[in-house]
């Protein structure tokens, strides 16, 4: 399969094949595995659903997390700046916010990994 490149802010960005995690998503999956092992969550899946937002507009969240009480959450993983802000393209943030409004039976979260120089912890923000 031929890789497609996108030109973003002066840099080329290569698209990953569907179902392939980037480094930040891989690190977050390890956090979810630990939560599942301890029983804090029932299970999680990577990119299991695609939400239809409008004609020719779709959104695939990174993770769906199910809790023992049956509650479901959508977790979108993004890198964070040193200051704690999320590194996300404007169109991605619009899609996440629209999806959260259209599908209110999920709780929606942005999850971000701070850089090591800022502590390397995870930051969460409910949408």
What is each residue range found by the language model?
Residues 1-127:
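Electrostatic, structured charged patches in enzyme active sites and in nucleic-acid/phosphate-binding
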């Amino acid at each position: 399969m031929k890789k497609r490149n996108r030109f973003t802010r002066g840099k080329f960005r290569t698209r990953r094949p569907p179902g392939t995690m980037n480094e930040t998503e891989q690190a977050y999956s390890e956090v979810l595995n630990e939560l599942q092992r301890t029983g804090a969550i029932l299970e999680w899946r990577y990119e299991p659903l695609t939400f239809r937002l409008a004609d020719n507009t779709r959104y695939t969240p990174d993770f769906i997390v199910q809790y023992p009480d049956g509650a479901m959450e959508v977790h979108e993983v993004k890198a964070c700046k040193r200051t704690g802000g999320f590194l996300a393209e404007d169109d991605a943030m619009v899609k996440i916010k629209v999806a959260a409004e259209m599908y209110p039976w999920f709780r929606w979260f942005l999850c971000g990994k701070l850089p090591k120089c800022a502590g390397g912890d995870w930051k969460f923000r409910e949408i």
